[in-house]
């Protein structure tokens, strides 16, 4: 270890080597030693938690021009390459010698060889930054440690906002996840993200978009999903929110594909997480924590009327990194959907912009990065090391034609399989590809799946069997249309949530349908009046909650066909789907291709 420390001493800032030596973590020192030799930086800067270090990173982000200071105190803006604006599915690989359905794999030795070649000498002439973080609260049974190595001040600045710095927790050879990133060169053809499950290491090069470069975000999710499946807990792409009911607060997790309502749902309750959740079982109860302490959110469409909490965060002094929005000539920002007057000209990720060009002022996947503590609706348990008990789970999709706004599952297995594992959603701008194309995306997590869905779902089902009280599971859809017009307003989600809370509290009844339990009209009418102060007509209800049996049948058959291709799929998955299909067919024989909720209520 001494020789490795002596080598690092030539690169690391004064006194940091002593700190590194004091925590006595030989694998950590060897890891840093190997990465420095691989990437060949001019110097190395460790972030161990001091205010001085955090300020140093902020200054470096500005000096490097990776960020530009804006007129509001604490606000900066970052621009990514015009072709590096979203998660790069086609350039992201799980290193595996076995092909996995729906997972982009590459043989391990081939992938490592390619990546190490790209990283060799990639930091020459630059400074390397090393951050030491905790996923989940410190001193918690949920805690997972992670190290980020990067040559991008913007990336490490983002990590400092989004994650708990936990250098001292790395003592005595504690295990940790490893993330190595180099912004490399602006050559998208050489952009690569490789996830090495065998060594709990993720490599990323020739990219700066945070979804590809900020390791502890969605890159870490691949590693924690694997860890969760091996250990029997859940690592999920879910918000954690507390909703107040007549009997107190109830915590829900909420899973939505990116850009489909997850952040907006988390803003109507007490916020713990807007994106990720670790869920473990303690004494038969499911408890959850947020691995993060910040928000990396989509900004398009955020306006003062619909999103007052986020709007306040983005306009008050405090630490905010905007990315790929428009910077105006006076140092302010503008984004599409803000409902503010569009500026005459400005600067965005493509360079100079003017209104007459007709081009959008900001990218549809433009983002903001802020600390959780900036939000006025932050829950008091946001950093509770013991987590919060989960009473409900929401699986939401962007479906324009079929799914009702809210439905409750009959049971844990019914909800996991026919709602969560059957999710199909219109693709959004958060991933590269054609928008609005309906795609299979179970639990909104397929992009991050490092293993077979069979293993993942088996763990999910087994987790529920260990619970003495499992959360109720709900399917949400905010995007149902009729004649190409949305059937709901943005604020209606507050009513669907309120009904779910009443179901948890057992203060509302429900109508039995072949696809689950739906609300009675009178209950929703009362909730619309109480929650939103507006009337809710029978015609609205009937359009929203008519069960389109034929379309549900087609969907169920599609999902069955998908899962039958998996050799090792749990029999419970196919059986649950086949039972759903039989129920739907029975209802088609009785009612036809669709059935009004009023008719079901009478029957």
Curated annotation (Swiss-Prot):
Cofactor(s) listed: Mn(2+)
One Gene Ontology term of the molecular function aspect: phosphoenolpyruvate carboxykinase (GTP) activity
Tree of life domain: Archaea
Annotated catalysed reactions: oxaloacetate + GTP = phosphoenolpyruvate + GDP + CO2
InterPro entries: PEP_carboxykinase_C, PEP_carboxykinase_GTP, PEP_carboxykinase_GTP_C, PEP_carboxykinase_GTP_N, PEP_carboxykinase_N
Positions of Mn(2+) binding: 218, 237, 275
Binding site for GTP: 259-264, 367, 398
GO BP annotations listed: cellular response to glucose stimulus; gluconeogenesis; glycerol biosynthetic process from pyruvate; oxaloacetate metabolic process; propionate catabolic process; response to lipid; response to starvation
One annotated Gene Ontology cellular component of this protein: cytosol
Details of cofactor binding: Binds 1 Mn(2+) ion per subunit.
Residues the record marks as active site: 260
Function comment: Catalyzes the conversion of oxaloacetate (OAA) to phosphoenolpyruvate (PEP), the rate-limiting step in the metabolic pathway that produces glucose from lactate and other precursors derived from the citric acid cycle.
Family annotation (NCBIfam families): PRK04210.1
Similarity-based family: Belongs to the phosphoenolpyruvate carboxykinase [GTP] family.
HAMAP family: PEPCK_GTP
Database matches in PANTHER family: PHOSPHOENOLPYRUVATE CARBOXYKINASE, PHOSPHOENOLPYRUVATE CARBOXYKINASE [GTP]-RELATED
The protein, known as: Phosphoenolpyruvate carboxykinase [GTP]
Organism from which the protein derives: Saccharolobus solfataricus (strain ATCC 35092 / DSM 1617 / JCM 11322 / P2) (Sulfolobus solfataricus)
């Amino acid at each position: 270890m001494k020789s490795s420390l002596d080598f690092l001493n030539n690169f690391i800032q004064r006194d940091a080597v002593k700190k590194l030596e004091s925590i006595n973590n030989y694998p950590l020192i060897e890891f840093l030693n190997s990465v420095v030799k691989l990437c060949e930086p001019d110097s190395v800067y460790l972030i161990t938690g001091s205010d001085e270090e955090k300020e140093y990173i902020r200054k470096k982000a500005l000096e490097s021009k990776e960020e530009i200071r804006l007129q509001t105190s604490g606000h900066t803006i970052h621009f990514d390459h015009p072709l590096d604006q979203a998660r790069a599915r086609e350039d992201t690989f799980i290193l595996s010698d076995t092909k996995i359905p729906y997972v982009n794999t590459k043989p391990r030795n081939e992938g490592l060889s390619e990546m190490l070649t790209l990283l060799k000498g990639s930091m020459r002439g630059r400074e390397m930054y090393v951050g030491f973080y905790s996923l989940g609260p410190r001193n918690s049974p949920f805690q997972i440690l992670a190290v980020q190595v990067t040559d991008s001040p913007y990336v490490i600045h983002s990590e400092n906002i989004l994650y708990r710095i936990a250098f001292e927790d790395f003592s005595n050879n504690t295990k940790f996840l490893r993330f190595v990133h180099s912004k490399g060169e602006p050559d998208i053809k050489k952009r690569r993200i490789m996830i090495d499950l065998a060594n709990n290491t993720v490599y990323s090069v020739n990219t700066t978009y945070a979804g590809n470069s900020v390791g502890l975000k969605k890159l870490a999710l691949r590693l924690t999903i694997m860890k969760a499946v091996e250990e029997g807990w859940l690592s999920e792409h879910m918000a954690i929110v507390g909703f107040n009911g007549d009997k107190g607060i109830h915590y829900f997790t909420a899973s939505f594909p990116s850009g489909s309502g997850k952040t907006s749902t988390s803003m109507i309750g007490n916020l713990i997480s807007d994106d990720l959740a670790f869920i473990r079982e303690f004494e038969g109860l499911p408890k959850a924590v947020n691995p993060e302490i910040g928000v990396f959110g989509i900004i398009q469409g955020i306006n003062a009327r619909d999103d007052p909490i986020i709007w306040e965060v983005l306009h008050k002094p405090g630490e905010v990194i905007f990315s790929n929005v428009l910077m105006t000539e006076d140092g302010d920002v503008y984004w599409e959907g803000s409902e503010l007057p569009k500026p005459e000209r400005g600067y965005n990720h493509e360079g100079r912009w003017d209104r007459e060009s007709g081009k959008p002022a900001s990218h549809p996947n433009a983002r903001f990065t802020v600390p959780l503590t900036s939000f006025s609706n932050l829950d008091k348990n946001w950093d509770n090391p013991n987590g919060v008990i989960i009473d409900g789970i929401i699986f939401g999709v962007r479906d324009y034609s079929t799914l009702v706004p809210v439905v409750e599952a009959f049971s844990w297995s019914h909800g996991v399989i026919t709602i969560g594992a059957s999710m199909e959603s219109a693709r959004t701008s958060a991933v590269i590809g054609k928008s609005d194309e309906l795609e299979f995306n179970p639990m909104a997590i397929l992009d991050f799946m490092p293993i077979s869905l069979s293993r993942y779902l088996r763990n999910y089902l087994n987790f529920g069997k260990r619970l003495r009280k499992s959360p109720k599971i709900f399917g949400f859809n905010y995007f149902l249309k009729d004649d190409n017009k949305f059937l709901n307003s943005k604020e209606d989600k507050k009513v669907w949530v309120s009904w779910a809370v009443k179901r948890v509290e057992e203060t509302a009844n429900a109508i039995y349908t072949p696809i689950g339990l739906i609300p009675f009209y009178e209950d929703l009418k009362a909730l619309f009046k109480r929650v939103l102060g507006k009337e809710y007509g029978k015609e609205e209800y009937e359009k929203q909650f008519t069960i389109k049996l034929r379309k549900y049948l087609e969907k169920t058959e599609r999902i069955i066909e998908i899962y039958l291709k998996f050799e090792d799929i749990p029999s419970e998955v196919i059986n649950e789907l086949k039972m759903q299909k039989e129920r739907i067919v029975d209802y088609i024989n009785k009612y036809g291709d669709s059935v009004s909720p009023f008719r079901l209520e009478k029957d």
